[in-house]
A protein has these predicted regions:
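Acidic, low-complexity/disordered tracts enriched in E/D and polar residues
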Residues: 1-55
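Long, charge-rich, low-complexity alpha-helical segments
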Residues: 2, 42-102
């Protein structure tokens, strides 16, 4: 499997450590005012919430997904169980589309 091949597998868990897949970059298109995940021959425009999830849960500086969920729970003053369910679903989708890897 390469970076462009989607990985369909089990859901992302709170103990997982995620990083952007090889060849994927988080970029800000200042002209359009949009953040996006760019990969070879494809891109995904992120809304405000998706950007917050990627920043909180993906990258070498993030201990694990649980730490990102805790950060988002505090930042948005929302019930942790709801935040966790939404975040894990979004991250699993991003992984299945080949944008993030464990």
């Amino acid at each position: 499997m390469n970076a462009l091949t989607p990985h369909i597998g089990p859901h992302i868990g709170e103990s997982d450590r995620l990083r952007l897949a090889p060849g994927v970059m988080l970029r800000n298109d200042r002209r359009r005012g949009e953040w996006m995940l760019m990969a070879p021959e494809r891109l995904l425009v992120l809304d405000e919430m998706a950007l917050a999830v990627v920043r909180a849960c993906v990258g070498p500086e993030v201990a694990d997904v649980a730490a990102g969920i805790d950060r988002l729970t505090a930042e948005y003053d929302a019930p942790r169980a709801e935040v966790a369910a939404d975040v894990l679903e979004m991250l699993t989708d991003l992984r299945n589309k080949g944008y993030v890897v464990t």
